[in-house]
């Protein structure tokens, strides 16, 4: 595997040279984009290696928030997308629907919006999801989802139906969650992590989750022992 750190607009001729000398058909490439303004780095620059790109990571800690991921569908073998730090809270993710191999999506800086759920609900191959503000009432079925990391979970009531094969769940800073009975419906769970669920007062009996092997609790200030 090859990780390419992109800090400025790439030189297309140098990318072609890289393709000729280092990158072969079997080389898997992850683009790690971290510039002063990631909006200036168009995905079309990477057309010559587009079939090799299996991961895109966008890191942005300047005032230039990421406004678009237009053109990302050029990477037809893309399996993982990480969008970290500042991005437009109305970021259009519609193009992800055409990425038939996408297994991982990380977008947890801003809460997911009602405009983004229709796309999320079509990502049937998704195995790993890291997100903020998830409401299970807005989900349709994500049958292949195995790992869920959620900040500020709004409602988990229907996760057992919507993500029946979930094996690992981590929930952080979620004061809207008052009870954890929905965990009982996640029959395949092997790992549970709870941190900052400040209004949960008691844990349900998890003894029927026969696959559960690990659990961590932190900052559960109202939880009664």
Enumerate the language-model features and the residues they cover:
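Concave beta-strand-loop units of leucine-rich repeat
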Residues: 2-95, 101-140, 144-178, 182-225
